[in-house]
Amino acid sequence: IPGFKPWTSEDGKVDITVEHLLTHSSGIDPYLNVKSFVEKYGENQPDSLVRYISDNAGRNFRPGTKFMYSCLNFIALQAILEKVTGERLCDYAMENVFRPLGLNHTGYLPVGENPVIDLKYCAPTELQHEGAPLCGQVHDPLARRINGGNSGNAGVFSDAMGLSVICAAIMNGGTANGVSILSPSAIDLMTRVPEDIDGGVGRALGWDHHSTHSGPRGDLFDRESTICHTGYTGPSIVIDMKNRIALIILTHRVHPQDKGSLARFRAVIANIIASSMMTSSCGKPGI
C-alpha cells in the first residue's frame, strides 16, 4: 500500500498489503483511544484517522504471521476503496450492492442524509450519558464519532431478509435476485484462507474461517467449508458453502449496557441447525 508505514525489525521491513488487512494479519493496533483522538483532532475527522493509521498506529508483528482483529484494518480498506472509486463507502455500497439486490432496508446512516431505513426498524443499543439509548446510529464510537457513521469497520443497518439475500449471493457465486455483485472467482477467494498467509491465522478475506473468533460456527459445521462473522453488538452470520446453509442471528448484547455475552448462545444455535441438517440428510440424529 503506497505511503503506508511497513513493519520493521532487525531483519528488515515487510510491507502491509490489502490481503493482510482483509485477513486481520497486518499487525496494526486493534483500535485507538477515541476520547484522546477527538480531543486532539475533533469529531468527524476521517482524513486525520486515515493518516493516523497509515503513519502512527502500532505495528505489532510481522504481517501475515498472526491473527489480531483490528477495526483499523477495515478503515484502511475503506480509504483505499474510496480513493479508487472516488465515492464514499456508504454511497458505493448502496449503488453497487444494496440497491441492485433490492435491499430496501439495508444501508448506512439511518440518521443522516437521505435515510433509507425507518428508525422504527432500528433496535436501540447502549444507553448514553444523557440517559437515552443510541437508535439509528452506529454503536461503535470510532465509526460514529470520528467517521461520522460512514465507516469500514461498522455502520451497516439491515434486517434478516436483506442479509439472507447477501448470503444467497455468496453461496451462489456472487449472484442473487438475478444480479451479480461479485464474480465466482472472487467468491472463491474470499471464502478460503489465502495460501501465502500462515495457516494459524485462520482468516479468509473478510470472513472468519477457523481462527480463535470462529466460535459462532459451533462444533458441527464443516471447518473447511464454513465461514462466519460477528458484529460487536451481537449479530452473527454463519455460511456453510458446501451445504448451502446460512444462519443469521440478529440480536444484541449491549442494551441497556455493554455487559452481555452471546458466545455460548451463538454456538448452541449453530449446533442445533447443523445437527438438524445432518438428521435430514442422513435420516438419523446427527448428535
Description of each model-found segment:
Residues 1-5:
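Acidic helix-start/capping segments at beta-turn-to-alpha-helix junctions
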Residues 8-224:
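Short, surface-exposed loop or secondary-structure junction motifs
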Residues 7, 176, 256-260:
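A generic structural signal for short coil/turn motifs at secondary-structure boundaries
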Residues 229-287:
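Structured C-terminal helix/loop/strand segments within mature extracytoplasmic catalytic/sensor domains
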